[in-house]
């Protein structure tokens, strides 16, 4: 696509985000299909890295990949009352197929707990069949009215884990293990700090006993739910009659979990690290970590510069941008907007001096280095950039996290925050998990994001709405 100016974050954060996605060649709206997007090669390559990082960890913890049908009988969703109520507004329903009206409509998968519950009831009979640890890579449809690329679209890609266990303790261990796994990928690979915590009743997954999440702070101070892990208890086991014979010979219902992350992570990545020049990718997540741009003016310089560029690229695993008809400046601009961590400049003078110029995407600094040290220098720059991006994001979260001891304080802090103008904060306050408290926060468009598992603050205190004693502070914020 044609290169266009990128809106400054300070001017309009939402427009800036849209510009970075488009100019980074990550995705574009699919205007012909309402609420959907086309994930372009650059964006999908980032998703593939995330897939590999997650999939390797799933398999290391004995999970197997499976695939279940996209179409789910509508009656399945009605078997779990809270589940169908939670998803009803987002459902896409197929009523006609093969030119004929269907006897029973199919729902296009919004999530797979119901259809997996059906098959679990066929496969699980004894405690020897447990635990059953499955993961599915899939697309889902949730009919969204207000969409934003990667963050909220009618169709999106994700993984959804589904497990069955013989007892509740084991299921809870699984839920927390996966929550830790998600946090590890977010922080170690994406350089995106997160808060692990339990969701309130109003924010939990429809049909779960308890839901947990990782919450990240974007540069505008708004929260992004980056991943969830759910303790389903025996709700779906009872709804789909998933029973097993225990070691003691008793017939019992299984305990289940489900958990997932999606292409929404890419939106979180962009809003955590990118700048007014365009996309910034953490090295561990970047599909292309370094690019060499050959610079020459005369035809007689071309062969020597290109030969050296390809030789060095082979040594360090870099890409050479040897496209004809593009100036070096246009090439630098191209890779800057696409978030490549390191760009190396190589020209005739560099050849003569045995040097090459290393430019970092995060700091914009340029450094001439010896060609003999290029491998070590690039590796060091990538490692330093990965750490630096995490530290910068962590410091931002810390600087924009505040304590409040009254609902008036919370409202004053958050009421003017918007996705466009920023000004968001994470407000740590004691608040009771009940509808009246949720309703009070809703008055200024805030929610409880989660109640952190690790209490870094001051323990029990008075609820900011009811005045009752609450064990620990929750994260209150405006969110995507």
From Swiss-Prot:
NCBIfam families assigned to the protein according to its UniProt record, in alphabetical order: proS_fam_I
Gene Ontology cellular component terms for the protein in this record: aminoacyl-tRNA synthetase multienzyme complex; cytoplasm
Role noted for this protein: Catalyzes the attachment of proline to tRNA(Pro) in a two-step reaction: proline is first activated by ATP to form Pro-AMP and then transferred to the acceptor end of tRNA(Pro).
Any single GO BP term: prolyl-tRNA aminoacylation
Gene: proS
Homology family: Belongs to the class-II aminoacyl-tRNA synthetase family. ProS type 3 subfamily.
InterPro entries per record: aa-tRNA-synt_IIb, aa-tRNA-synth_II, aa-tRNA-synth_II/BPL/LPL, Anticodon-bd, Anticodon-bd_dom_sf, Pro-tRNA-ligase_IIa, Pro-tRNA-ligase_IIa_arc-type, Pro-tRNA_ligase_II_C
Subcellular location field: Cytoplasm
Name under which the protein is recorded: Proline--tRNA ligase
Free-text comment about domains: Consists of three domains: the N-terminal catalytic domain, the anticodon-binding domain and the C-terminal extension.
Oligomeric form and interacting partners: Homodimer.
Entries under PROSITE patterns matching the protein: AA_TRNA_LIGASE_II (PS50862)
Enzyme class: ligase
